[in-house]
C-alpha cells in the first residue's frame, strides 16, 4: 500500500496509451459480455474522458461497484483473463495502514507484475493455478516497459477438508481457534512433525501419485 502513488501513475500511463478505460457496467453485464466476447460501450471512450473519470475514480467520487478500471485486452481471446480484466476497483473500507487516504485499489494482476519489477525479482515460483494469468501480466509488463521474470510453475497437492493458505491459518491462530502453527489439528509441516510424520513421507507420497 506504500506504493499506491506509483501504481496510480502506471494506471494513468495505460490510460494515456489508450490501453485502459473506466467502465460503468454492472458486474452481471460485464460478466455476460466477457463470456460472449463482446465489447461494452465504455471501451469506446476517448482518452481525455477516461483521464477525467480516472481522476474522479481515485478521488473517491464513485460508489463501490459503480465503476472499475479495465485493461484493453482481446475480447476474442480463448484466455478469458485477456478479455478486458479489471485492474482497479473502488473500496471505501478503512485500510489498516493507509486509513481512508485511498479509495481506488489495484487487483492482483495489476500490482503483482509491477511490484515484482520494482523489487528486482528475477525468478518466480508459483503453483499452476496462476498459469492463465501469465499472459495478462506479461502483456502489462510490455505496455509499461517493465522487466519480465523467469517463471517456474509446479503442481499443487491439496488435502481435502483442510486449508493450507497462510492468511487463513494465521487468522485462525490469532483468533485462538488453533494453538499455533504446530497445532496437531492442522496439516502444516510443524503440526505433522508433532504427530510423528516427517516431511520425507510427503515427498514419497507425491512421487507415487
Question: Across the structure, where does each feature detected by a protein language model lie?
Answer:
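Extended, domain-scale alpha-helical bundle/helix-rich regions
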Residues: 180-209
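Secondary-structure capping and boundary motifs in well-ordered enzyme cores
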Residues: 3-6, 103, 194, 198
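Charged, low-complexity surface patches
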Residues: 3, 130, 181
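Hydrophobic alpha-helix position signal
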Residues: 14, 141, 172-173, 192, ...
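Scaffold signal of the M16-like zinc-metallopeptidase fold and its non-catalytic homologs
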Residues: 164-181, 185
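Active-site cores that bind ATP or allylic diphosphates and position pyrophosphate for catalysis
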Residues: 6, 10-169
Amino acid at each position: 500500500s506504500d506504493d499506491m502513488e506509483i501504481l496510480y501513475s502506471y494506471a494513468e500511463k495505460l490510460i494515456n496509451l489508450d490501453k485502459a478505460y473506466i467502465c460503468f457496467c454492472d458486474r452481471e453485464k460485464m460478466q455476460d459480455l466477457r463470456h460472449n466476447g463482446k465489447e461494452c460501450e465504455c471501451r469506446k471512450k476517448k482518452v481525455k474522458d477516461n483521464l477525467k473519470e480516472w481522476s474522479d475514480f481515485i478521488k473517491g467520487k464513485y460508489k463501490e461497484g459503480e465503476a472499475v478500471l479495465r485493461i484493453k485486452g482481446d475480447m476474442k481471446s480463448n484466455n478469458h483473463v485477456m478479455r478486458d480484466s479489471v485492474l482497479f476497483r473502488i473500496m471505501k473500507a478503512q485500510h489498516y495502514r493507509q486509513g481512508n487516504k485511498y479509495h481506488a485499489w489495484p487487483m492482483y494482476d495489476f500490482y503483482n507484475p509491477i511490484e515484482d519489477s520494482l523489487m528486482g525479482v528475477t525468478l518466480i515460483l508459483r503453483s499452476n493455478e496462476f498459469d492463465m494469468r501469465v499472459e495478462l501480466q506479461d502483456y502489462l509488463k510490455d505496455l509499461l516497459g517493465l522487466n519480465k521474470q523467469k517463471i517456474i510453475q509446479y503442481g499443487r497437492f491439496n488435502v481435502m477438508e483442510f486449508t493450507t493458505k497462510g492468511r487463513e491459518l494465521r487468522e485462525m491462530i490469532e483468533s485462538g481457534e488453533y494453538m499455533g502453527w504446530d497445532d496437531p489439528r492442522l496439516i502444516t509441516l510443524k503440526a505433522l512433525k508433532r504427530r510423528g510424520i516427517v516431511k520425507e513421507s510427503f515427498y514419497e507420497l507425491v512421487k507415487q501419485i
